[in-house]
Amino acid sequence: AGRYAYSPDCVAPSAVKSPISPFVPLALDDEGINKQIDDFVSCAQLAKSAGYDGIEIMGSEGYFINQFLVEHTNKREDTWGGSYENRMRLPITIVEKIRSALGENFLLIFRLLLEELLL
């Protein structure tokens, strides 16, 4: 859940504390971001192997993916932050890798928040 996680080991795009958790998240490095992407793919593969026809990827409500999209929680100055194109890199990469791993017939729904009200 990114910075919303109630754990001293929480991670996020940047070290921006959530108002609902006492812990400041660790800003992920490239290796950590790629592990998170791989974990999304692994979870999608588990859903498919369990017989699901598809999954919904939660890119909204202030959770992990959404934290990369929003300037308030993404203070990065690398390929994962800054411009809107860079901030969209994480969700696009997750979707592309899931699609590549599971094929065109596995249903993917991506929930995207259109207005950021959660800080």
Predicted regions and their residues:
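Flavin-dependent oxidoreductase catalytic cores
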Residues: A1-L119
